[in-house]
Amino acid sequence: MIDFDGYRPNVGIVICNAERQVLWAKRYGQNSWQFPQGGINDNETAEQAMYRELYEEAGLTPKDVEILYVSKHWLRYKLPKRLLRHDNRPICIGQKQRWFLLQLVSDEKRINMQHTKSPEFDGWRWVSFWYPVRQVVTFKKDVYRKVMKEFALFLFDTNLKSRLSVPEEKKMFSSVKKKLIHKKNHKYSSNQ
């Protein structure tokens, strides 16, 4: 299913552990890493698609995770021209994604990327929260930056800010907080 603008509806999944690390998955047969994601089928809600993709790509079921947060808006990225399939109609120019932040509540041994006949991933690891923003393929960086900033506002409280060990994490969290304060102050002053 492709929308009128040429974007395929899709879900993205960020799974975190108790240490607030996130699951980073290696594409099958490649040296390319990303979060699990997948298309939303006709007659399927975003949440239903997320659970289906979660099982297909990571072998996890609804009882293995808890939904912590869902992105407020659809986030879009365009595919590079070299990845466009011109033999398909309509042409898909990119993905529009609804993102889910999940907490793994079962043992990590339940994660199984190889349980289907054609797995999307052949490996995974836990990485620091902001690591994917720096490492994902270029055309997805903006979406990853936006979704991780949105999730950070939910996942990290101000008490945790002082305990973050990576300077970039401190810097990014600080900039997100400043933007929110600026927006809040601007909104307050414009309402008078």
UniProtKB/Swiss-Prot annotation:
Location of the Nudix hydrolase domain: 6-149
Cofactor(s) annotated in UniProt: a divalent metal cation
Database matches in PROSITE patterns: NUDIX (PS51462), NUDIX_BOX (PS00893)
Any single Gene Ontology cellular-component annotation: cytoplasm
InterPro entries: Nudix_hydrolase (IPR020476), NUDIX_hydrolase-like_dom_sf (IPR015797), NUDIX_hydrolase_CS (IPR020084), NUDIX_hydrolase_dom (IPR000086), RppH (IPR022927)
Record keywords, A-Z: Hydrolase
Gene3D superfamilies cross-referenced by the UniProt entry: Nucleoside Triphosphate Pyrophosphohydrolase (3.90.79.10)
Class of enzymatic activity (EC top level): hydrolase
Motif (Nudix box): 38-59
Residue stretches in coiled coil: none
Protein name, as recorded: RNA pyrophosphohydrolase
Species this chain originates from: Histophilus somni (strain 2336) (Haemophilus somnus)
